[in-house]
């Protein structure tokens, strides 16, 4: 079984001189899910949306082409794709000739699907930037915080009263790469229907990820699971938009299966 320590993270790696799909490094999702008590049927559906800003190849005549792309990896896939390996893989296309842009798109989709173990969709272009931001920010709450990890679900609570349907947001999520320790920065949005979630407790909970080491996808699944267990919403959506590194950013979204409408697809200004 592949582990994060076996990947190219934190190592000096020669950039590939030619197309090489073996560079893609899948990491099984099962271990991260077992750590938060998920061993059977998943309580969510969703995807990991990647934005690729540095994509290039050669056309049939050897002239360079450039593009951006959006990749959708379903959360039902047995494996996630380690980010540095995806960067190296995309760079392996730089000196490779293709007859058309569609051939490039299809090749990337096929290679990612093979390594993730499920159908990965690829489309050229990026979502628009959300200049306003969805939801009501909780970041201006005037509270003292001195707990930066490990993540503490005990902070999560609800208020008795009328059922609400609302969208809350924070730009203060920070976690760390589990191999290199590099900081990962994100905005997180949660949409739910249920008893009102205590906002001070929610902010303390999100800040408690600050010293936590885990992959982006696993952080979002932990947030979803903790909110589901502690706050028992009728339905829930959690999305994190992580800032760019190595020409890529990752945007995991997890939703209750009965969620009526998905969150709109946007990028953050910080991305």
Curated annotation (Swiss-Prot):
Pathway: tRNA modification; tRNA-queuosine biosynthesis
Top class in the EC scheme: oxidoreductase
Any single Gene Ontology cellular-component annotation: cytosol
Subcellular compartments: Cytoplasm
One record GO biological process: queuosine biosynthetic process
Reaction catalyzed: 7-aminomethyl-7-carbaguanine + 2 NADP(+) = 7-cyano-7-deazaguanine + 2 NADPH + 3 H(+)
Residues that coordinate or bind substrate: 81-83, 216-217
Role noted for this protein: Catalyzes the NADPH-dependent reduction of 7-cyano-7-deazaguanine (preQ0) to 7-aminomethyl-7-deazaguanine (preQ1).
Name assigned to this protein: NADPH-dependent 7-cyano-7-deazaguanine reductase
Species in which this protein is naturally found: Xanthomonas campestris pv. campestris (strain ATCC 33913 / DSM 3586 / NCPPB 528 / LMG 568 / P 25)
